[in-house]
Amino acid sequence: MAKHPEPARHEVPAVDEAALAAARTADKLLECARQRGSQRWAEFLAPVPDLLRDAGVGELRAVAMRARAAYGPRDSIRDALPAELTGPFLDDLDRLRKVLARELAER
C-alpha cells in the first residue's frame, strides 16, 4: 500500500493558520515567562513558537502534544503564568490538533 506524500503547509491552509495562531500565542507566553523570570517555562517554551511555524504537517501533531504537556496535573504552566495567556494557548493547541485530525481523516 503506497503512502501518500505529506502535503506542504501552504497546501493545507487550515492547518497552517491554526499552527501560526498557536505560534503567536506561544510567543506571548514565552515573553511573559522570561519577564517573570520563570526559567523552567521559558526553557520549555523556547523552541515551541519556531516549531509551530516551521514544522511540516506530519510533525505538527507531535509539536502540539509536546506543548500541551505543559498543562500537566502536577506541574502545570497555569501555576506559573497568567490564565489570560495559558488559556488561549491551550485553546490554540486543541484547535490545531482538531484541524490536523480532520486533515488526516480526509486523506
Question: Across the structure, where does each feature detected by a protein language model lie?
Answer:
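Intrinsic-disorder/low-complexity coil detector
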Residues: H4-E6, V12, V48, G72, ...
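Amphipathic alpha-helical interaction modules
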Residues: L30-I77
